[in-house]
Amino acid sequence: MVVSGVLTAPAVLTAPHSGTSNTTFVVFENSHVNITAPLPFQHPSAGPLLRYSLETMTSPGFSSLAVNSTAVTPAPAVFKSLNLAVQIILSAIMIFILFVSFLGNLVVCLMVYQKAAMRSAINILLASLAFADMLLAVLNMPFALVTILTTRWIFGKFFCRLSAMFFWLFVIEGVAILLIISIDRFLIIVQRQDKLNPYRAKVLIAVSWATAFSVAFPLAVGNPDLQIPSRAPQCVFGYTTNSGYQAYVILISLISFFIPFLVILYSFMGILNTLRHNALRIHSYPEGICLSQASKLGLMSLQRPFQMSIDMGFKTRAFTTILILFAVFIVCWAPFTTYSLVATFSKHFYYQHNFFEISTWLLWLCYLKSALNPLIYYWRIKKFHDACLDMMPKSFKFLPRLPGHTRRRIRPSAVYVCGEHRTVL
């Protein structure tokens, strides 16, 4: 047995009986004792003496004693850190995501701010979504990137809590915008109610930001108290037995994913059902109705089905764009939400050796959504595409133009031909 200590106020205890091993315990205040001999090899008479010595060490005179026994307490499990190749790959991916997220969403915000023609209700909502994604790229992604490079959090506990608040604030705001747009599409296509205007869109944006802040703010004040991350590249939820902590994780998972997912899914199912019924009703009209029945039915009776067909074409394309955004949201956020819940309630999952790598890949997948959104706007929305090309310097206009069949063919002032000599205005 080896006993070691750091010298301040010594006291010596020796084995009192003959025939025992020459075992001496040197006890010091503020000392560190390291017992390295396994228990089976200790002399039987040393047991009572060891207990007596430890009791003496815990007396008021030795209140600062720290004992480290490798024979009794196993070493804590050490998680598997990232190897150099994985670090390089993850760092390169994050740099790409950060670059595209910041510049792409910045362009979206500038287009809506600078161009009056772009300030429709839907575009204002999309600008708010882009603003949240841009702030996520500025206030969260760089620190996660540094943590990947250093494999430890170096920014302190306060900023750990603050970054967690920012993360969930921007996430909840982005989800709220998707929810508002989906409900608006549902009201327009299913309920035939177009209630959203730019003023109401701004009010809804203010309400969504206030709601997101009220949900995320407790993280900044340490309720629940997040520890400095040692098993993830940023402050995330980890295993705990605290019921309040667990309740908060469930609440934020419901608000940020499950409730919006169910509401948006219901809205999209209703929209798809309505579009299918409208398509069947429109195609049920005979081809010659314009010419053979125009004099009997009148032009006003013909205007509604044809106008419905035109409106459904536009609404279907806008709905498809929102559907793509929703699909990206599901693919990027469903794994991370599941991971957060399992890590909070499963000790085995949280303490497995490759948890750091798992959490990093899933977090990167979440950040990928912020980079994909502006690319979807550019691909699907012609106004954003054209405005983006107008803002770019001529030397950088290398992006291809949209195919001809995707350009808008119908204008609100157009005249739609019903027959050879009949038109509907």
From Swiss-Prot:
The chain crosses the membrane at residues 88-112, 124-148, 166-190, 203-222, 248-272, 322-345, 358-379. One of its GO terms (cellular component) is plasma membrane. CDD domains: 7tmA_GPR63. Brain specific. Keywords: Cell membrane, G-protein coupled receptor, Glycoprotein, Membrane, Receptor, Transducer, Transmembrane, Transmembrane helix. Belongs to the G-protein coupled receptor 1 family. This is Probable G-protein coupled receptor 63.
